[in-house]
Amino acid sequence: MMLPDWKIEKEILIEPFSKESLQPAGYDLRVGKEAYVEGKLIDVEEAGNVIIPPKKHALILTLERVKLPDDVMGDMKIRSSLAREGILGSFAWVDPGWDGNLTLMLFNASNEPVVLEYGERFVQIAFIRLEEPAKRPYRGNYQGSRRIALSKRRVRK
């Protein structure tokens, strides 16, 4: 069962929480403080925006920390306004028990650069209640992330 707006506000820890981002059956996550584009870490808060060049991908940190109970998972979709500009998103499930800011991958399939402003709503997350709490909620490599998290596959020695 997907959670409606009033249950999201009551049951899911999202900080900082924005009433404007709360949707009937989801929450719009906003562009956070960091991005990673073409091998460079960008301070989006200081720069005011991040530019995703044509035919390139970017990792974008969410402004919000999301903490899920052990019986709720998240499913994310790119906002349609960005999809209409050629932005594609590849997002994993947000597992029950997750706690942290999310690092999300966007790809600019267009021939024009796309600018994302700091604090702009860019991805909607919907919350789905499981029939029962997970026996093994998420406690993996990215748990507690507050900054851009690059792939742990490339960090291995």
UniProtKB/Swiss-Prot annotation:
CDD domains: trimeric_dUTPase (cd07557). Gene3D superfamilies: 2.70.40.10. One of its GO terms (molecular function) is nucleotide binding. InterPro entries: dCTP_deaminase, dUTPase-like_sf, dUTPase_trimeric. Pathway: Pyrimidine metabolism; dUMP biosynthesis; dUMP from dCTP (dUTP route): step 1/2. It comes from the Archaea. It holds the Pfam family DCD. Transmembrane segments: none annotated. DCTP binds at residues 79-84, 95, 124, 138. Its EC number is 3.5.4.13. It catalyses: dCTP + H2O + H(+) = dUTP + NH4(+). GO terms for biological process: dUMP biosynthetic process; dUTP biosynthetic process. Keywords: Hydrolase, Nucleotide metabolism, Nucleotide-binding. Catalyzes the deamination of dCTP to dUTP. HAMAP family: dCTP_deaminase. Belongs to the dCTP deaminase family. Homotrimer. This is dCTP deaminase. It comes from Thermococcus gammatolerans (strain DSM 15229 / JCM 11827 / EJ3). The gene is dcd.
